[in-house]
Amino acid sequence: TNIEAVASDPSNPVEGQVWYNTTSNTVKGVVNNPGSWSTSGNMTTGRRDLAGAGTQTAALGFGGQTSPGTISALTETYNGTSWTEVNDLNNARQYLGGDGVQTSALAFGGSNPPITNVNQKTESWNGSNWTNVNDLGTGRRLLAGAGATNTAMLAFGGDPGIANTENWNGTNWTEVNDLNLGRHDLAGAGTNTAALAFGGTPGTPRQIDTELWNGTNWTEVSDLNVGHRECSGCGTQTSAIVMGKDLLAELWNGTNWTVTADMNVPRARPGGAGANNTSALAFGGESPGTFNSSENFNSGPTTVTFDVS
């Protein structure tokens, strides 16, 4: 079989395609990567119990706990290589919910010492600053969120075992239909009209339940393979990933969960960002010390260089 010779790599190669790059004198091709983690840039300040938004190459991390009893308002952006500190939250907090993109995100709920001091505060991020907006109807911590922008968000779950769900329209929160299973320390993905809720506690030892939100109601769908709590999630209702508290990670394809490659570092309550189950970022967390490290997850068609020596 003849291998195509090209001066530069094809712009849109497909799985199984092989070529010879005459500029680099290498044989390359596209293979399927079932899933792998790689080290990425360190955050400027290590912390746990933070929230995240955005994608693998344009992420936002905010809030959290830097050390026992020290709650953070810090916000950082990630550009695919390095983290940069930007303007703080107005209200320092940990165990908060959040989602959106790097230029349009929402932070809500959480707690401050003592740990039982939950709050209802909501803040909107416009890419430069956080602005206080209308509060959640029910203050809580250890909740999850799903949303694409700071004008459309879903908040659900919370401690202790709360099933409450609220929808944000850019101005106010409105209570909508509850989760079927009340829980906290869960994760979420998707938007306020097409969301996914998974994992959490209470349960022995961790919940495997997954629920799908259609804009009106929650419906139980296929379970996780392994119970997850103190975890993070990102993606869409049909393409999501769950990561933490341990090394374990799983991928959702819209119907079922599949166990994928272990994380490099076991991290509890990390921040997460990602567009789908082929591209994600996990950052911060603790096990038991607080981390500033982050790592990338990638799967699917990947260009590799073949050793033909």
Regions found by a protein language model. Give the residues of each.
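Polar, enzyme-active/binding microenvironments
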Residues: 1-309
